[in-house]
Design a protein with these regions (language model features):
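C-terminal accessory helical subdomains adjacent to catalytic cores in phosphodiester-
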Residues: 2-149
Length: 149
């Protein structure tokens, strides 16, 4: 099955899945992943609301931690965002649990209706070495090649 670059993201996700490729998509925006560091978001919100919400949540956490007013303003693509989240006491493992629970609450493949939903937690688990399926595949490959583990 071949799709062009003009096909919908849903078809792209289905094509990736059918080829054993997992996608780290979010609906409505990547920033949902950041929101899960603070709260278990189960109701939809507009992508236009994310920056303000993240700014507010980080400021509240920083004020609780330091006792001082925070001047933090969320900036898209900030390479320090993970450090900011962890630095103000956010729990990455809790974010993974909440994102995973919300993702599992949807069962159909009409991904556009999965709102809010993010698969970024799967990428984070992979990067942290916590993806059990991936780890088993790597162990099997290493064993097959005679590599020490």
């Amino acid at each position: 099955m071949r799709y062009s670059g003009t096909d919908s993201p849903i078809l792209s996700i289905k094509m990736a899945n059918s080829n054993g490729i997992r996608c780290a998509w979010s609906n409505e925006a990547f920033e949902l992943w950041y929101i899960y560091h603070f709260e278990n978001r189960i109701t939809p919100m507009s992508r236009n609301e994310y920056a303000h919400k993240i700014t507010t949540l980080v400021r509240e956490k920083q004020k609780l931690k330091t006792g001082k007013k925070s001047t933090f303003v969320y900036k898209k693509n900030d390479p320090e965002m993970r450090s900011i989240l962890l630095g103000c006491g956010c729990n990455e493992q809790q974010a993974i649990r909440w994102a995973k629970e919300q993702s599992e609450s949807f069962d159909a493949q009409d991904y556009h209706s999965h709102n809010p939903c993010t698969q970024v937690y799967e990428l984070v688990e992979l990067l942290l070495g916590e993806d059990k399926v991936f780890n088993e595949k790597i162990r099997a490959i290493m064993t097959k090649r005679g590599c020490k583990q």
